[in-house]
Amino acid sequence: MSRVAIIDFGSQFTQLLARRIRELNVYSEIFPHDIAFDYIKDSKAFILSGGPKSVLDFTGMPPIVHDIIELNKKTSVPVLGVCYGLQLLSNYFNSTIVHGCGQEFGKAILNVVKKSEMIKDVWKVGDQPYVWMSHADSVYDTPCGFEVIACSVVNNAIAMISNEERRIYGVQFHPEVYHTPDGVKLLANFVRIAGCDNNWTVESFLDEQENLIKKQVGDKKVIAALSGGVDSSVAAALTYRAIGDQLHCIFIDNGLLRYNEAEKVRQSFVDQFQMPVTIVDRSSVFLDKLQFVTDPEQKRKIIGKTFIEVFEEEANKIGNVEFLMQGTIYPDVIESGGSVGKESVTIKSHHNVGGLPDIMKLQLVEPLKLLFKDEVRLLGKKLGISDEILMRHPFPGPGLAIRIIGEITQEKVNMLQAADEIYINLIKKYNLYDVIWQAFAVLLPVKTVGVMGDSRTYGYTCALRAVTSSDGMTAECFPFGVDLETKIIFYEFLQDVSNTIVNNVQGINRVVYDTTSKPPATIEWE
């Protein structure tokens, strides 16, 4: 399978660049700029990403750029520089880079002045297409051996260059963002120029990964901590398809999960897939250790430590286990700095099993570590996993422990589980679940006076949270950013959910809605 290697110089859009290439059914992979070149020199094409640094600040060209250009000199392997990547290429080929002069942020209009294979069937000479810019430095003059393909209408700054003979291209704008309408078409031209195979599909990944799991594991036993979330569920289904009963899934009920979670996991995996899952109820153990604890970080540590103790105890009952399966996905690998070819590789562990590979001396099986979240969901569909699991909202590792503000008791857990179940079910009834990125209820350590019938009540306050987001890094309170009709429906929904919770959950007599964005707040309360 041919690969487009994306060299990451720190752009916030690097993952998006990889996704756009994969949407063209071409396999792309992100590598840090300090990777050993031998690991990637067999790539079909190279893309130099954008980044926050300035070419004017370093004293020498990054070695990876020199290696790629030298390879191109011998083989004409295609190279594309995006934003900072363009400036790196231009600097390498003796162009002048200037700061401040020609800077642009946001929407921009180009003048197309020359033909290029990069713009074939997309733009023609004389066109003035919209693109999206985000740069303070600019390329002042044409690099040696290159031609200018497009300039900015506003300041005539160089926006696109090409060396057709050597198949080296550079763009000052970001083709990977949706604000550049023709960006994907330009990237499609680049992979066409490179002669990349269009065979990166969920089906091809499934077949290949199944064989890789069989080869890695052989006849040995594999254990997995099943959480009921998207990633661990898809990873477990794929691994079970590959090795069958050699996989031993353990689901630990810590008493802080969503309502009836253990039963839902049993129905999904035991009933649907006939996959053996050991369901271990240790609710009392976790709740006992959390008694009188109010600090959220202390809660997390206690839950993490107790989880490892329980998981290790259950794993030892199986015996002779050599592998641990984890639902690590590609963004986890990238964000933790892990990549092939680096001197030290740190893989982000599952929130509850961090440290287990070292403690139990297990080898890792990570069947999803090359997939983005949307690809994981597509794979899950191919494996027959229900939308009930695949489209679930994110749920924190410590569970309801960080949604019960203050001390945790069984009574509070019961109240919050009931309130949250009502909230989520009504969200689905109003057809809002798929347009909300994450929604949940929070139990506050605040009691207020209320009236029910002719009696005075003194009960807890429940806060509702619902946000829209693309990646969880930033978030807006729902229903900002949606149409007026949805907003009207949402206000009707809030009245409905408030009344339903207060009338059906004993101990809660007031419901409030959290309207804070991230930043300044975080999505979770603790």
Curated annotation (Swiss-Prot):
Membrane-spanning intervals of the chain: none
Pfam families: GATase, GMP_synt_C, NAD_synthase
Catalytic activity: XMP + L-glutamine + ATP + H2O = GMP + L-glutamate + AMP + diphosphate + 2 H(+)
SUPFAM superfamilies: Adenine nucleotide alpha hydrolases-like, Class I glutamine amidotransferase-like, GMP synthetase C-terminal dimerisation domain
Ranges of residues in domain GMPS ATP-PPase: 200-392
Pathway assigned to this chain's UniProt record: Purine metabolism; GMP biosynthesis; GMP from XMP (L-Gln route): step 1/1
GO cellular component terms attached to this protein's record: cytosol
Enzyme class: ligase
InterPro entries (alphabetical): Class_I_gatase-like (IPR029062), GATASE (IPR017926), GMP_synth_C (IPR001674), GMP_synth_GATase (IPR004739), GMP_synthase (IPR022955), GMPS_ATP_PPase_dom (IPR025777), NAD/GMP_synthase (IPR022310), Rossmann-like_a/b/a_fold (IPR014729)
Gene3D superfamilies: 3.30.300.10, 3.40.50.880, HUPs
Assigned keywords, A-Z: ATP-binding, Glutamine amidotransferase, GMP biosynthesis, Ligase, Nucleotide-binding, Purine biosynthesis
Domain Glutamine amidotransferase type-1: 3-199
The UniProt record lists the keyword Nucleotide-binding: yes
Residues annotated to bind ATP: 227-233
Oligomeric form and interacting partners: Homodimer.
Role according to the record: Catalyzes the synthesis of GMP from XMP.
Protein name according to UniProt: GMP synthase [glutamine-hydrolyzing]
Organism per entry: Ehrlichia chaffeensis (strain ATCC CRL-10679 / Arkansas)
Lineage, uppermost ranks: Bacteria, Pseudomonadati, Pseudomonadota, Alphaproteobacteria, Rickettsiales
